[in-house]
Amino acid sequence: MGVKFPAVRKKLCARRSFFERCCFKLKAARLVAPQTFDFVELDEPTPVDGEAKIRIEATSVCGSDIHGIYHGATPEEDYPLAPGVPCHEIAGTIVESKTDELVEGQRAIVLPTRGMGGLSEYLVQTPDRVLPVPDWGGIDEWVMCQHTGTVLYSVKQMGNVAGKRIAVLGQGGIGLSFSMLTEKMGAQQVIGIDPVEARREKALEIGATNTVAPAKENMYEAIEDLTGGEGIDIVVDATGDPEGFGQCLKIVKRWGTFVSFSLTGSKGKIANFPHQEFMFKAATIIPTQVAATSQPTKDIREMIALKERGWADPGLLKSHNVGFEDVQKAYDMYSDQSYGVIKVVMDVNGGGA
């Protein structure tokens, strides 16, 4: 499929400097228009001192990529996007290392930088962005620790959740991670809220005590009934929807806690903000985004360790595997919430096991 915006084709050239140290070819996907991918062949990168080269074996779709980029929030003049974009949930095997901190043959989660996304067969990275994982278990399951690790950071901002009633609005990969972790940490009640039946079922499997189907019942009345009139101590917005912020303000009890994780694609706007509710509830509102902290990898590393010892398994959130060549299908599945998708992984270079 050709580039739909030929006037900006030259922008791609400026973005290729990352790949200039090379001797072989790799395949990478990129967005050339809203909701439209194609593949490009690029020179394979070679690490310099202090870097390692990783063969990517599993890439996963993130909701923020869908809401913030895939649906067309990017200005038209920025297309085509850089190779590999949008994707930041990736894992693979170190095939060449020029740093004492990383060993060839080690599997790892990788956080891409330098404008390069994860929809690529290979990339190079510095050790601070490469997070080793054990050599057992499927790499397509270990990659789930990336997004659940970001949730681990957010859950820590809640303080002690033991004995608390918690509602999580949205039960995609992020929302389900909140349901799983807060239950593990001793929450008295965890209510998963989502219109998709498959996601509500998964919520009950991994820790939620109750679920609410907002398309079928009055969400606020259902929560009132489920809590016996006690209300929600902590509410989480994991929707990626501009309506989510206001809905959470209505859900949380007076003087409760509202944890905002959601990133929307509507230029950051909040829809139907309930100002009266905001003033009356006087809730503590905590925006959480681990990527904006000084230690963006700390909680992901901790999540890897927690999975390794069996405390919690983010791998349970993976619902589908597709081939790398089916990148368009993978993003469409996530966007449409079709086939009961929760987290879809693309197997790259024969990965997925």
Regions found by a protein language model. Give the residues of each.
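C-terminal capping/lid region of NAD(P)-dependent oxidoreductase domains
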Residues: 16-25, 229, 259, 266-267, ...
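Glycine-rich beta-strand-centered segment in the early N-terminal region that forms part
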Residues: 45-60, 73-114
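Residue-level marker of beta-strand positions
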Residues: 51, 106-107, 122, 165, ...
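NAD(P)H dinucleotide-binding glycine-rich loop of Rossmann-like/cofactor-binding domains
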Residues: 88, 108-169
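Local beta-strand N-terminus motif with an aromatic residue
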Residues: 120, 231-232, 327
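Mid-domain Rossmann-like dinucleotide-binding core that forms the NAD(H)/NADP(H) cofactor-binding site
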Residues: 141-217, 221
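Glycine-rich cofactor phosphate-binding loops and adjacent beta1-alpha1 units
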Residues: 161, 206-283, 353
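C-terminal substrate-binding/catalytic core of Rossmann-like NAD(P)-dependent dehydrogenases/reductases
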Residues: 269-319, 328-329
